[in-house]
């Protein structure tokens, strides 16, 4: 990933959106509300927690300061990482856009806070062999996770009239789905108030 980012930092995209609070948070939230996807009995709770979540995201961005944006993979999780005898290969670049480098690193981490700190240490050791990482970006880790939650719900909702989507995602657009998202966002609000994850 360090090599990909070293290349990605050379030029900017002209025709792709940035990964930012507006495109991944504010606009998806507005779309879901305008199209009445939130069950009426949960609507006020969802409105309230998404407002709090976006305030938390903005605060994380303020703490991080002015950061370099580069061309990202954009959806870098282990399902998009294939290992061969020649090493790792990244696939599925259709979500590539401009954004902070941490977007392509945080989804590689899993487990509790201590485990993620250890994993982050290993990831950055390899990454910085090829490209420098600005540690201020660690303030964005939970903010980007929060934006992904909002964006993904809207992404599914925007495609819900496609007959393939209800078959592929039967759990979406149920009361239980939105209850779970409200709980997740409450957890994210708390996590964004904590000190950033740090390599050990």
Task: Write out the residue ranges for each language-model feature.
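Active-site activation/catalytic loop segments of kinase-like enzymes and analogous catalytic loops
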Residues: 101-132, 148-164
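Hydrophobic alpha-helical segments that form the core
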Residues: 22-25, 144-154
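A cross-family kinase active-site recognition segment
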Residues: 1-45, 69, 168-169
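Short, mixed-charge aromatic SLiMs
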Residues: 22-32, 128-134, 171-188
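Active-site acidic catalytic loop and adjacent metal/ATP-binding pocket
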Residues: 4, 58-105, 200
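All-alpha amphipathic helical-bundle segments outside canonical DNA-binding/catalytic cores
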Residues: 16, 135-145
């Amino acid at each position: 990933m360090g090599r990909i980012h070293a290349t990605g930092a050379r030029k900017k995209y002209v025709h792709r959106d940035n990964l930012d609070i507006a495109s991944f948070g504010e606009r998806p939230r507005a779309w879901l509300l305008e199209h009445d996807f939130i069950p009426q009995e949960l609507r006020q709770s969802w409105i309230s927690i998404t407002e709090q979540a976006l305030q938390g995201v903005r605060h994380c961005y303020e703490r991080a300061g002015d950061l370099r944006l580069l061309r990202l993979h954009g959806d870098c999780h282990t399902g998009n990482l294939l290992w061969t005898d020649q090493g790792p290969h990244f696939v599925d670049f259709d979500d590539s856009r401009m954004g902070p480098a941490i977007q392509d690193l945080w989804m590689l981490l899993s487990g509790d806070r201590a485990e993620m700190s250890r994993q982050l240490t290993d990831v950055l050791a390899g990454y910085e062999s090829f490209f420098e990482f600005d540690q201020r970006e660690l303030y964005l880790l939970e903010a980007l996770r929060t934006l992904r939650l909002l964006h993904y719900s809207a992404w599914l909702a925007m495609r819900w009239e496609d007959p393939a989507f209800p078959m592929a995602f039967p759990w979406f657009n149920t009361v239980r789905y939105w209850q779970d998202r409200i709980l997740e966002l409450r957890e994210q609000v708390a996590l964004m108030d904590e000190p950033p994850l740090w390599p050990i």
